[in-house]
From Swiss-Prot:
Enzyme superclass (EC): translocase
Protein name listed in UniProt: Cytochrome c oxidase subunit 2
Organism of origin: Albinaria turrita (Door snail)
Main location: mitochondrion
Xref: PROSITE patterns: COX2, COX2_CUA, COX2_TM
Alphabetic keyword roster: Copper, Electron transport, Magnesium, Membrane, Metal-binding, Mitochondrion, Mitochondrion inner membrane, Respiratory chain, Translocase, Transmembrane, Transmembrane helix, Transport
Binding locations of Cu cation A2: C196, E198, C200, H204
Positions of Mg(2+) binding: E198
Places the protein is found: Mitochondrion inner membrane
GO cellular component, one term: mitochondrial inner membrane
Length: 224
C-alpha cells in the first residue's frame, strides 16, 4: 500500500498491474530521452552564434523530424494498445464479485458462491485497533481466493462512484443502471486497499475498499 513520501508506484499484486508498471517505465524512458534531446538542442541554440541567410530548405532534416516522432508514437502506441486489450480480458471461469456503490459505503455480492449482500462501512478512527489504517479499514471485507481469476462487476445504487484497487490495476466507474466489469488475479495472499475514486458527495473520502485474498481452501471454508 502507499506510504507517506512515496515517490514510486505501489508494489504490484496482479499480472495486469505488473504490465502497467512495465509500460510506465517504457513511456518514461522515451519521455526522458525526448526531454534530454530538446534541452540539449535548446542550450546549444542559445550559445550558437552562427547563422545563415541563404539556406531555405533542409530536406534531410525535415524528413528526420517527421519520421522520428512518428516512430516514437508507434513505439508508444503498440504496447499501450496491447495493455488496453489485456485490461478488457476476463476469464469465463472466474469468480464473480459484484460491487455496489452507495453514499457512502460499498456492498458486495458473490452469486456464484451463494454469498448474499455484504455491507462494507469504514471503521471510524476512534474504533481502530493498533496497526490498523486510518480511512482504509472496513467492518466487513469481501474475501477472494488468490491465484484465481476474479471478475468484478461494479454498479451504483445512487450517484456515480468508482471502484479502485490500485495494487491490482483495477479502476472502473460504478454508474447507476449500468454494469461495468473488469478482472484481476491476485498473485499473493493479503489485504489490499483502495478507495472510491469518483467524487460522490460530502463523505466521498470515507468509503474505502478492502479486499482480502486467501488460500482457495480457506475461501471455500468461509463460503460454506
Amino acid at each position: 500500500m502507499s506510504t507517506w513520501g512515496q515517490m514510486n508506484l505501489m508494489d504490484p499484486a496482479s499480472p495486469i498491474q505488473i504490465e502497467m508498471m512495465l509500460f510506465h517505465d517504457h513511456a518514461m524512458a522515451i519521455l526522458i530521452g525526448i526531454f534530454t534531446l530538446v534541452s540539449c538542442l535548446g542550450v546549444k541554440l542559445c550559445f550558437n552564434t552562427l547563422s545563415t541567410r541563404t539556406m531555405h530548405e533542409a530536406q534531410l532534416l525535415e524528413t528526420l523530424w517527421t519520421i522520428l516522432p512518428a516512430f516514437l508514437l508507434v513505439w508508444l502506441a503498440l504496447p499501450s494498445l496491447r495493455l488496453l486489450y489485456l485490461l478488457d480480458e476476463q476469464s469465463s471461469e472466474g469468480i464473480v464479485l459484484k460491487a455496489i456503490g452507495h453514499q457512502w459505503y460499498w456492498s458486495y455480492e458473490m452469486p456464484s458462491m451463494n454469498v448474499s449482500s455484504i455491507d462494507s462501512y469504514m471503521i471510524p478512527e476512534d474504533d481502530l485497533k493498533p496497526g490498523e489504517y486510518r480511512l482504509l479499514e472496513v467492518d466487513n471485507r469481501p474475501t477472494v481466493p488468490y491465484g484465481m481469476d476474479i471478475n468484478v462487476i461494479a454498479t451504483s445504487a445512487d450517484v456515480i462512484h468508482a471502484w479502485a484497487l490500485p495494487s491490482m490495476g483495477v479502476k472502473m466507474d460504478a454508474v447507476p443502471g449500468r454494469l461495468n466489469s473488469m478482472g484481476f488475479h491476485a498473485n499473493l495472499p493479503g489485504i489490499y486497499y483502495g478507495q472510491c475514486s469518483e467524487i460522490c458527495g460530502a463523505n466521498h473520502s470515507f468509503m474505502p475498499i478492502a479486499i482480502e485474498a486467501v488460500d482457495v481452501k480457506d475461501f471455500i471454508n468461509m463460503c460454506n
